[in-house]
């Protein structure tokens, strides 16, 4: 069977991916935004948190915490839940627990993406980023592109050329250039 897809559809798909505001390297395949996102906020005592705020624990475990009931955190560090989807109270805040596989991430800008035509389709090149601080040790498995403002995961790809390479917390790393291709079946 021969198929044909209008080239503007490729543009639409790639344009939706190119609004990404964060790129993350993950130790496992993320299936949602929370598993790939790493917030810049670490839990702090006696702090006002709004609905939807995202934090990590001071020990940087493999979880991310979402404020599901706004309030003020307690004066001492809570017992952070370590079961995905569990909730717990901290002062007057209620947190929901999410698995998190992100080990390093970097902000993305519109000029970090270059869309070009290729034979039978289009591609989106994601530019290289260097000197990115690793915040959690783990092996490289997947790269995710995220729309942070809308809490959406836009694209995930297996990091085949560096799959399994261990990253160590505190070191610097490189996010290599890669291409996202949409090609018509021939």
Place the predicted regions along the sequence by residue.
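Short beta-strand elements bearing conserved aromatic residues within extracellular beta-rich modules
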Residues: 65, 142-143
């Amino acid at each position: 069977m021969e198929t044909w897809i209008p080239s503007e559809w490729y543009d639409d798909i790639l344009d939706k991916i190119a609004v990404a505001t964060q790129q993350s390297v993950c130790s496992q395949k993320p299936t949602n935004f929370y598993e790939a996102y790493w917030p810049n906020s670490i839990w702090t005592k006696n702090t006002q948190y709004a609905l939807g705020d995202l934090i990590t624990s001071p020990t940087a475990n493999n979880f991310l915490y979402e404020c599901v009931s706004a309030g003020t955190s307690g004066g001492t560090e809570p017992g952070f839940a370590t079961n995905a989807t569990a909730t717990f109270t901290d002062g007057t805040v209620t947190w929901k627990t999410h698995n998190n596989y992100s080990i390093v991430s970097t902000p993305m800008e519109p000029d970090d993406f270059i869309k070009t035509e290729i034979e039978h389709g289009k591609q989106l090149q994601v530019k290289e980023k260097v000197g990115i601080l690793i915040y959690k040790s783990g092996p490289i498995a997947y790269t995710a592109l995220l729309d942070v403002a809308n809490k959406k995961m836009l694209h995930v790809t297996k990091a085949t050329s560096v799959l399994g390479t261990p990253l160590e917390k505190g070191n610097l790393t490189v996010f290599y250039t890669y291409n996202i291709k949409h090609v018509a079946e021939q």
